[in-house]
Amino acid sequence: MKSGRWILLGWLGTWLCGIGSDAAIQAVTPGSSGLWRLRSDWEAVQPGDALRLRPGTGAVFEVDEQALQTLLSGAPEEFGTWAAKAPTLLTLPQPDGSSVRAWCVASPVMEPALELRYPELRTYRLRGLDDPGLTGRLSLTPQGVHARWRDGRGWMVLEPLPGMGPVLHRVYARTDLVEAAGDWICETPVPPLAAASGGFGPATNGGILRVYRLALAATGEWTAAHGGTVKSAMAAMVILVNQLNAIYEAEVGIRFVLVSNNDRLVFTNAATDPYTGNNASALLEENQRTVDSLIGEANYDLGHVLSRVNGGLATLSGVCRSGVKARAQTGIGNSNDPLFVDYVAHEIGHQFGARHTFNGVRGTCGGNRDESSAFEPGSGSTLMAYAGNCQGDNVQFRSDLYFHAASLDQILQGATGWPGSGCGYQVATGNQAPWVRAGPPRVIPRGTPFFLEAEG
């Protein structure tokens, strides 16, 4: 088994421990079949500054916002007794106009004190009923419903229709995004990798969920692009961190929660905030000073600042390390670009020790290639690559939301060893590696076609 994703699905399934069947859960769980109404009179594709969908893809739905709030208010906490006995049953709209049912439990991405101050910002974890392989996360805020889930077809995105308020939402397959900005660049320096000492890193994330306290700051420019108030910026941050967790939990068993005083890091005036808004390098040192001063060095595990600089920069392997753990920033010119979470995931990957995996040298790939981990052709396609940003070397226009095997190894090494094991906390999930029976050994002549069956 070389993929930790397969095993984590077993953990997500632990909600149902002790339950004989899905029917038993349905008997005590309210449904949600009337929440969404297909709006065929609206175009599913809305032109944006840096985003297009394939023609004829996606669908637009009108949500019964009050009914959804009422339904989700009864969702049990994910690690409580009722999460296993009676998760809330939720219907999710699909890009083809149909719907799919999923179990839903409350899964906060804020520390308790912060959550008490912002009760209107709610986040949830999803697990499929009709499709048991479906996993993802959903947020409900004054900005509407935002959800990302992965099933057998890939990642689906549900978000408010741009410019149409919190009632109309579009849903589409992420593979139908066909155009990105094309000029985003990660400036993280890549020092030579020391020679490997031999052996292998951890094969999976095991039965442990690793939780890190994230101090997430916002420049005045970023806040202005997200409503201009602390409340509106906090809503955008919660949506972002929830989407980030959908990736990191599935890939490496890591979760991020916003620290108790995170709202102190949201600045609303670009003229008076402590940041040089258009200088990525300056932002790193400024953010380290700001987070240490306002949050306290002992009260967070990693820090990050969101800006309007069109690029990212982070200290490699900075998580948990005093003096450098908040030296990271991500920015983008188009504030509502759904690809923004890709870039934040990329920079946080650097904070855990992951390096660039692309092999291209043209466009923004030039000067940023890391010889020690250049496994992917051209711009690459995974999260630590440069998909869509290496003009002349692009193999596709947006990242696939998973890490290359080398990145998985680097991040898991960073989380279970140095430096990530020095902070954060762990939650036992009860997850176990699957045991597969493939039958007794067989010897067949070379070149013989065969079909392999296994169970477990």
Where are the regions that the model predicts?
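A residue-level detector for conformationally permissive "hinge/kink" positions
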Residues: G10-L12, L89, S98-S99, Y118, ...
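Extracellular (secreted or membrane-anchored) zinc-dependent metallopeptidases
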Residues: T204-G456
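Zymogen propeptides/activation segments of proteases
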Residues: I19-S281, T429, A454
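Positively charged n-region of N-terminal signal peptides that target proteins for export
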Residues: M1-R5
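Bacterial N-terminal signal peptides
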Residues: I7-G18
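Positively charged, low-complexity intrinsically disordered regions
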Residues: W6, L38, V171, A328-T330
